[in-house]
């Protein structure tokens, strides 16, 4: 408060039984109201006075004057609606109690729903109160009470929910005489009470607040003439009890600033930064109010949004993270339970980024001269939080926005050419209109902090984002700002990059900083280069590399070295030949019972020739074609080959049609040693039972390589993550650090979250070999070079979104349907747009239920990620008639026919409200339709009076008639008493 006298706040509350709903909401609201008022530092002391009536054990009670808000909370929580034997209450006693304790200028908020005792409503408690007050030398006359309040500098603002003259006239008289206003609430829910009271007090302080729906001001229908009133009984029609009454009307509420309370709330920003006790108070209030039921109280003035932004900027205070977590929980809760409030809070957070007050002040006070100045020549504008993404991610989209701004800057030399702004005008939220120029005479500190204000009005960067902005201006060679940017970067060299901040570990920021090493210290360069490699490793999991691998045959006709078996005289592959006791070649098929045990020999030639293991239960019959009589099905230079899945040796196959199990050579299947030889070109191994080539293995070239070396190589496209998983130690030695073993390296982790788990190696090595599927890559050196190129660049291979045809890092593309037969991929936004097109209550887009390319239903995990609700509809396997439009029913949650296409050329507009015919015909028992023609929702009455409020459209109506809707509860009660004689007449069906 700006050098004003002390001002106190008194809150007077009717706590009788009729205030049940009102007081229940009020007790919650008061806790929010007193905390919000406390952080304005305008009100010095607060006192809450509760009153009932003279038939109750407790007529009045008070919290006493307190300056510490925590001392009020127990009293507020103890407020209960009780007692009150007749309609009027002991309001005059409460007013006298107030007069007894007031010491300073006082603002009074008076909540009530009933009049004070008066001869027009006199019953038993009337006599009790008049006797008590007169006997105690107190004031009983209402008009005299109002005059005394005014004389004592007490201004009263009644807040009531009754429009009847018999009630409202007393409070209109009180507010008129004391200089206040009477506020009429159309609804007494917590939200309306809190919003109205806080906005009332903030308006008195000088904040521009618009009172929208839910509250009106009550005024006399003619000009108030105090001199015509003698007392409460001779009241000239301003109060009940006379033959003619002056009407009480409702008008739109407008509250002017009061000189007692006028203050500049913006000064509290500097207090937050300078006073630790005040900062503690702000944190405590935000923590208390950060709940779904009370967070709206923070949204009624932009100063509270500024406090939220200050809290979010406080990096070294653990309370910030607690509040941010609370806010996340609140937003998630409101998103599910109260969409309207969720929108309000989201907009409030958005407003918290707008610092137009501060920016305008910097331009006016820190600039030596207005010109030369920078202005923006563009039609594109952004929100402050959009441009502030520059501080968080430095991604391409945000950087392009900044470049767009810098390229649209113009230099103005003459003051008369500057954009004109009415500095006295305020926007819809009470903020000044932003100035649209930035003087170049501002010091660099301010120039680069408020420069984004041109494209995102209200933007005011802290040091870090302003340094990033200067970096972009320098890199893009902006002729107006390059020299200033260079000076700014040189001045802060080594002073602004805090390695404890998560934002400094993002890939975009790292890559940007390494473009200007001249403005980094040696330590910072080493820091960024190291984490650029870490980032490069993390993002390249989906990058594809071309690798050359030794070919893997499976029932494939290949070149072969063959020799004649000296027993059967068939030309056999060298992989099937053994040496008998006489030193002659003997193929596996020629082994006979005469040579060895029958079972063993059966297994020998069975395995070698057709790979069918005897132990699997498959037996060799006596009339089998296996054995020496088995003829070769290939010529003398070719055989059908397999690769053993255990030892990876190649071996030939004779009876191909008998092969029906996993390939395994004889040695691996029976765990015996079998000689083999390795090709010096393709590195494939071959079974060599007779050791024909094993003795000269250093010069062995396999038959496939002899014929055509290119045919012995399979060229594969393999994802980097598959190579990494099989060569971890090798790749770690190449890059110089080890990634943590307990995480999925390519699972989308941020660098900051794993940086403490990264083990930096003392030295790096230069291995030249890599394996894939247990075989050595033939082009390992080239693959290593390609891998390191991607890792060291801090960038990843891009792929094409097959829906929007934009390029994205492959790690940011997903399979559209998840089926192996469909390899189509798309970006997140396109996936969300495609599968998210169908919404409950709207027209069903049948195509969006399937993959846009293969036309199959997507896998559950894909669909659930982008539209979980639609999973149930897809699972029902509905067949859709192409001649019909279908809608998604709000009630049965099933696709239902809407109209034939031949009857409706254009798609029907369902507006999210589609209910199928079957569901529409089902109504709850004893229900009545809302009489609002635009609503018509079925409503059930479950006890209480006959005043009803539709929860859908908020209209009021009489349950007995249910044929007319009213705007207010007051109109409904007027109808009930006039037509039905009261609010509780029973319907014959009830």
Swiss-Prot record:
A zinc finger (RING-type) spans 801-854, 930-961. Disulfide bonds: none annotated. A zinc finger (IBR-type) spans 855-903. Transmembrane segments: none annotated. Zn(2+) 2 binds at residues 930, 935, 950, 953. Zn(2+) 1 binds at residues 801, 804, 827, 830. Residues 8-201 form the VWFA domain. It comes from the Viruses. PROSITE patterns: TRIAD, VWFA, ZF_RING_2. The keyword Signal does not apply. It holds the Pfam family VWA_4. Keywords: Metal-binding, Repeat, Transferase, Ubl conjugation pathway, Zinc, Zinc-finger. One of its GO terms (molecular function) is zinc ion binding. Residues 797-990 are annotated as: TRIAD supradomain. The active site is at 945. PANTHER family: ALPHA-PROTEIN KINASE VWKA, DUF659 DOMAIN-CONTAINING PROTEIN. This is Putative ariadne-like RING finger protein R811.
